[in-house]
């Protein structure tokens, strides 16, 4: 039954695209989102996105948007704001696909012959991987570099551990993140993931939101500082303050706006 349901998701994706008729995140527009990569890098991203879009076709976020929006946003942070290479962008998509659907065997996709006639050559594949191949065709031919698989495995391991709301647990969790990050880029991708979540905190229920801002304060802000991601650290601190102390945040931002208006007025008067 699980295989049949999964195949239906893929067929739905084939008909209406990753986001459905109301959005423009098709394979072509995803390709255009990452112009900084060469042809090989874009092909890698296209393959990873095809898997994620099929796997996540029926998943939605708390705001009702398709869940694929989350890995797309994380991938854009990794590419545009941090400057990570294409294999990291591919790892973002594959992580979310396999986190939601651990039955997907990414390494099996790599072993599929370049040309498959009928059902020949598919005997070693899981039903889910066969469904992916049938739905996406040439987009999935070939596999991924070994470092991509390792990054995905690291991200998936980190996703299974849940920190407690204490500083001692936070320190232990930070150590686990580093331990599971055999490739240091895994930690950077996890920070990019958290930044995307923080930018969309409004969609989460209050209890979940409070848990996430506390995790961010204790875990991700210190990690971002350690790695020299100072812009991301500052933004997460700002979002934390906005949700943890909303009244103080509004008072400070209003004062800053008033100061900015005064500065602009004085500048204009000086120019005149």
Model region roles, listed by residue range:
Residues 122, 126-132:
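N-terminal basic, low-structured, amphipathic or hydrophobic segments
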Residues 1-116, 126, 137-272:
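Active-site helical microenvironments for divalent-metal-assisted chemistry
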């Amino acid at each position: 039954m699980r295989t049949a349901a999964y195949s239906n998701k893929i067929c739905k994706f084939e008909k209406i695209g990753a986001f459905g008729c109301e959005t423009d995140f098709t394979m072509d527009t995803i390709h255009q989102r990452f112009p900084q990569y060469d042809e090989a890098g874009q092909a890698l991203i296209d393959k990873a996105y095809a898997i994620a879009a099929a796997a996540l076709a029926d998943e939605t976020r708390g705001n009702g948007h398709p869940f694929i929006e989350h890995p797309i946003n994380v991938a854009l942070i990794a590419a545009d704001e941090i400057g990570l290479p294409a294999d990291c962008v591919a790892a973002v998509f594959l992580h979310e696909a396999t986190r939601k659907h651990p039955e997907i065997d990414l390494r099996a996709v790599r072993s599929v012959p370049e040309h498959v006639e009928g059902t020949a050559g598919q005997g070693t594949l899981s039903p889910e991987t066969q469904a992916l191949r049938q739905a996406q065709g040439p987009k999935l031919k070939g596999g991924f570099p070994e470092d991509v698989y390792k990054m995905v495995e690291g991200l998936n391991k980190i996703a299974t551990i849940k920190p407690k709301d204490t500083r001692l647990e936070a320190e232990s969790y930070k150590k686990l993140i580093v331990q599971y990050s055999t490739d240091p880029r895994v930690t950077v991708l996890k920070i990019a993931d958290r930044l995307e979540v923080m930018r969309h905190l409004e969609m989460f229920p209050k209890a979940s939101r409070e848990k996430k801002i506390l995790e961010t304060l204790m875990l991700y802000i210190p990690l971002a500082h350690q790695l020299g991601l100072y812009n991301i650290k500052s933004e997460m601190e700002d979002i934390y303050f906005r949700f943890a102390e909303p009244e103080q945040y509004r008072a400070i931002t209003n004062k800053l706006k008033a100061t900015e208006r005064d500065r602009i007025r004085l500048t204009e008067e000086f120019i005149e």
